UniProtKB/Swiss-Prot annotation:
Keywords carried by this UniProt record: Cholesterol biosynthesis, Cholesterol metabolism, Endoplasmic reticulum, Glycoprotein, Isopeptide bond, Lipid biosynthesis, Lipid metabolism, Membrane, NADP, Oxidoreductase, Peroxisome, Phosphoprotein, Steroid biosynthesis, Steroid metabolism, Sterol biosynthesis, Sterol metabolism, Transmembrane, Transmembrane helix, Ubl conjugation
Name the UniProt record assigns to this protein: 3-hydroxy-3-methylglutaryl-coenzyme A reductase
Organism annotation: Mesocricetus auratus
Catalytic function, reaction form: (R)-mevalonate + 2 NADP(+) + CoA = (3S)-3-hydroxy-3-methylglutaryl-CoA + 2 NADPH + 2 H(+)
Lumenal compartment spans: 40-56, 115-123, 188-191, 276-314
Signal peptide: none
SUPFAM superfamilies noted in UniProt: Multidrug efflux transporter AcrB transmembrane domain (SSF82866), NAD-binding domain of HMG-CoA reductase (SSF55035), Substrate-binding domain of HMG-CoA reductase (SSF56542)
Major place of residence: endoplasmic reticulum
Highest classification ranks of the organism: Eukaryota, Metazoa, Chordata, Craniata, Vertebrata
EC number, as in UniProt: 1.1.1.34
GO biological process terms on file: cholesterol biosynthetic process; coenzyme A metabolic process; isoprenoid biosynthetic process
Length: 887
């Protein structure tokens, strides 16, 4: 019950920070103002001459008071030093704010209690400093700092208040009751000290429950990075703060405190109200005497200076003990501000992500792909640990394990590259007897009879006879693979047919075609096949993304691309890894329909935007697939033409065929309600597929992903060979201003298309979809305590990708998907593999952006390409087509 009340209080305070702060400050000022204007107007030394009471002030009292003040200052210093070890400037700032305002409230209470007399404040302040506790304030701040959004900040503050509020309330009550016992001692100095202590506890409690949570919420809201949607205050080592704070205090301790509180309440009640209080046990008897305001012995005088000058002169005049205290405070402040920073940085460097392990999440691994801890297998070595000596080799990193392809023809994933001639590898199994074929082609009629014979077939015909039948139009050229006994022979015959029609008959000599599993190509990937194009496949990595390491395959012929991306992956890994989120998932198809009049189109548009109309279309759409689920419709008009953009989840498939089938069924259903509607095309370019389009940039298409990382200044200098300031400057003027000057749509990046296309080719994606999938905005800014670290993020709103269907059925492409642990469909959570692949693409793009921008900032781009991207073969020794014809 109490936790619920404190949670509601925390949520209210965090949701209305301005109101709470203004109200708290106003209340505090009102307390001071009412005291100043309505209190006692007799002030000793200013308008009244008060008698000097002869009191023996022992030097030991002065020494004890001075030591107390110094201990209080040292106590506050060590508390702030411990907070600095957390590495968060927000923790320090918020704790400092808490201390300052708490002291202000406490001072106001003391002034009010002492009736405008400020001399007691010097004695009271050490007790306030000794009783202030920043641990709970910093704990509540950690709750807020572990949030990902402003809404989560409010929720976490409420949750923290629910956990910390009851404990803090009970502790404050016990402290007041324990310290309050001293006010009944009869010793005047002890009574005053205990009274100050109680006021200090109450002031801290008041600020913690009102001003502090509101201030935390407001500070984090004002410092939020609104453009990225991610707060810049969030720190990685606060990720588990909620788990730590969930451990509530020991119930036994809480019960003991409650019993103690009840006992102390009885003691206070008996001493103050039941028993006869003796005159010497009452501080009120001494109040006027202590303040020197006795009516009988005081005499009125004319003030010589104004009231504020009088108070200022009293504050400025210092004794030797005050000089010692202020000197200690000044020296500690100088040490903390100027000398402590280097020591803290060197201490934190031992915990720096450069040498610290990548955090392994406690979440149970999914069944979508097989994962194994590296250290679980004794004979297995982690290559990334061997390559990077700076990384702790005892760490336990979750690495994606490649899956073994579940197919009988796994051995055919590797194939021989080279000329088409020569002997093929020895076939497995028993060899069939050789068939003797005539040297000269037989007549077409006889060849047709053999081809159509169930006993013989195409294997009893020579290649020349097959070519003869093709030229005579008896066999369509596109059916060669299906009519021949093997697909490979059909490809070989097509190559022979094509060679005679080419300017250079030997053009296909270096285009390989043997030892490839064409059964996966036919009817799925390509028609009129004449071979396959071997493209070099490199690997970049390890890419540390979301606590896992990935070796990313990239198929490219551009020199430096893989090496550059690999350098970016290394920088990200040394910085502690990258984080990513999938913001949206939905493939689109935008058909165009026409109605007789524009008003009719407007009527259809209005009907589609009603809940009833959408429900009818959704039922028809969802009935076409067990994965396709219509999410929303985006409808627009151009005259009497109506463009309807269907958006749907498609599981692990990229989903163009799936959503096209659902769109077609939905349009047929729509025609039942509007018979005059004419379907012009199932794709009206409002999707938009494989074309630059602002609708994809704004609304998203496929997977919308954001990825971010923080690169320490040391890594920027040593790995990227540049500075944070230079990279930010180039990013603003190249990726943002330059792209805007060019009128770019989604091209606010350096070379996202390079990485996207290389991964797409390697992983069997539709390479043409790099047009929309490469939409990316790269942002960089300074971060860290000294603003020397580099914060980089890449936001890609339209990654069109899948792990089933199309080119992902080919064995080499499946091998690359297996490298990433995302091959095939995810059985437990449909669509998870495709979303994970989209995250990997975005993370790799960010690595490529990081490296290229560093090269541009350092001026290394041209030099590296001159070394690594230029062929060293003497091209004059190779005869080109144009050279030969000219000769």
């Amino acid at each position: 019950m109490l936790s619920r009340l404190f949670r509601m209080h925390g949520l209210f305070v965090a949701s209305h920070p301005w109101e709470v702060i203004v109200g708290t400050v106003t209340l505090t000022i009102c307390m001071m103002s009412m005291n100043m204007f309505t209190g006692n107007n007799k002030i000793c030394g200013w308008n009244y001459e008060c008698p000097k009471f002869e009191e023996d002030v022992l030097s030991s009292d002065i020494i004890i008071l001075t030591i107390t003040r110094c201990i209080a200052i040292l106590y506050i210093y060590f508390q702030f030093q411990n907070l600095r070890q957390l590495g968060s400037k927000y923790i320090l700032g918020i704790a400092g704010l808490f201390t300052i305002f708490s002291s202000f409230v406490f001072s106001t209470v003391v002034i009010h209690f002492l009736d405008k007399e400020l001399t007691g404040l010097n004695e009271a302040l050490p007790f306030f400093l000794l009783l202030i506790d920043l641990s709970r304030a910093s704990a509540l701040a950690k709750f807020a700092l572990s949030s990902n959004s402003q809404d989560e900040v409010r929720e976490n503050i409420a949750r923290g208040m629910a956990i910390l509020g009851p404990t803090f309330t009970l502790d404050a009550l016990v402290e007041c009751l324990v310290i309050g016992v001293g006010t009944m001692s009869g010793v005047r100095q002890l009574e005053i000290m205990c009274c100050f202590g109680c006021m200090s506890v109450l002031a801290n409690y008041f600020v913690f429950m009102t001003f502090f949570p509101a201030c935390v919420s407001l500070v984090l809201e004002l410092s939020r990075e609104s453009r990225e949607g991610r707060p810049i205050w969030q720190l990685s080592h606060f990720a588990r703060v909620l788990e730590e704070e969930e451990n509530k205090p020991n119930p036994v301790t809480q019960r003991v405190k409650m019993i103690m509180s009840l006992g102390l309440v009885l003691v206070h009640a008996h001493s103050r109200w039941i028993a006869d209080p003796s005159p010497q046990n009452s501080t009120t008897e001494h109040s006027k005497v202590s303040l020197g305001l006795d009516e009988d012995v005081s005499k009125r005088i004319e003030p010589s200076v104004s009231l504020w000058q009088f108070y200022l002169s009293k504050m400025i005049s210092m004794d030797i003990e005050q000089v010692v205290t202020l000197s200690l405070a000044f020296l500690l402040a100088v040490k903390y501000i100027f000398f402590e920073q280097a020591e803290t940085e060197s201490t934190l460097s031992l915990k720096n992500p450069i040498t610290s392990p990548v955090a392994t999440p406690k979440k149970a691994p999914d069944n979508c792909c097989r994962r194994e801890p590296v250290l679980s297998r004794r004979n297995e070595k982690l290559s990334s640990v061997e390559e990077e000596p700076g990384v702790n080799q005892d760490r336990k990193v979750e690495v994606i394990k490649p899956l073994v392809a579940e197919t009988e023809s796994t051995s055919r994933a590797t194939f021989v590259l080279g000329a088409s001639g020569g002997c093929s590898p020895v076939a497995l199994g028993t060899q069939e007897p050789e068939i003797e074929l005539p040297s000269e082609p037989r007549p077409n009629e006889e060849c047709l009879q053999i081809l159509e014979s169930a006993e013989k077939g195409a294997k009893f015909l020579s290649d020349a006879e097959i070519i003869q039948l093709v030229n005579a139009k008896h066999i369509p050229a596109y059916k060669l693979e299906t009519l021949m006994e093997t697909h490979e022979r059909g490809v070989s015959i097509r190559r022979q047919l094509l060679s005679t029609k080419l300017p250079e008959p030997s053009s296909l000599q270096y285009l390989p075609y043997r030892d490839y599993n064409y059964s996966l190509v036919m009817g799925a990937c390509c028609e009129n096949v004449i071979g396959y194009m071997p493209i070099p496949v490199g690997v970049a990595g390890p890419l540390c993304l979301d606590g896992k390491e990935y070796q990313v395959p990239m198929a490219t012929t551009e020199g430096c691309l893989v090496a550059s991306t690999n350098r970016g992956c290394r920088a990200i890994g040394l910085g502690g890894g990258a984080s990513s989120r999938v913001l949206a998932d939905g493939m689109t198809r935008g058909p165009v329909v026409r109605l007789p009049r524009a008003c009719d189109s407007a009527e259809v548009k209005a009907w589609l935007e009603t809940p009833e109309g959408f429900a009818v279309i959704k039922d028809a759409f969802d009935s076409t697939s067990r994965f396709a689920r219509l999410q929303k419709l985006h409808v627009t008009m151009a005259g009497r033409n109506l463009y309807i953009r269907f958006q749907s989840k498609t599981g692990d498939a990229m989903g163009m065929n799936m959503i096209s089938k659902g769109t077609e069924k939905a349009l047929v259903k729509l025609q039942e309600f509007f018979p005059e509607m004419q379907i012009l095309a199932v794709s009206g370019n409002y999707c938009t597929d494989k074309k630059p389009a602002a609708v994809n940039w704004i609304e998203g298409r496929g997977k919308t992903v954001v990825c971010e990382a923080v690169i320490p200044a040391r890594v920027v200098r040593e790995v990227l060979k540049t500075t944070t300031e230079a990279m930010i400057d180039v990013n603003i003027n190249k990726n943002l201003v330059g792209s805007a000057m060019a009128g770019s749509i989604g091209g606010y990046n350096a070379h996202a298309a390079n990485i996207v296309t290389a991964i797409y080719i390697a992983c069997g994606q539709d390479a043409a979809q790099n047009v929309g999938s490469s939409n990316c905005i790269t942002l960089m800014e300074a971060s860290g305590p000294t603003n020397e670290d580099l914060y980089i993020s890449c936001t890609m709103p339209s990654i069109e990708i899948g792990t089933v269907g199309g080119g992902t059925n080919l064995l080499p492409q499946q091998a690359c998907l297996q490298m990433l642990g995302v091959q095939g469909a995810c059985k437990d959570n449909p669509g998870e593999n495709a979303r994970q692949l989209a995250r990997i693409v975005c993370g790799t793009v960010m690595a490529g952006e990081l490296s290229l921008m560093a090269a541009l900032a350092a001026g290394h781009l041209v030099r590296s390409h001159m070394v690594h991207n230029r062929s060293k073969i003497n091209l004059q020794d190779l005869q080109g087509t144009c050279t030969k014809k000219a000769a």
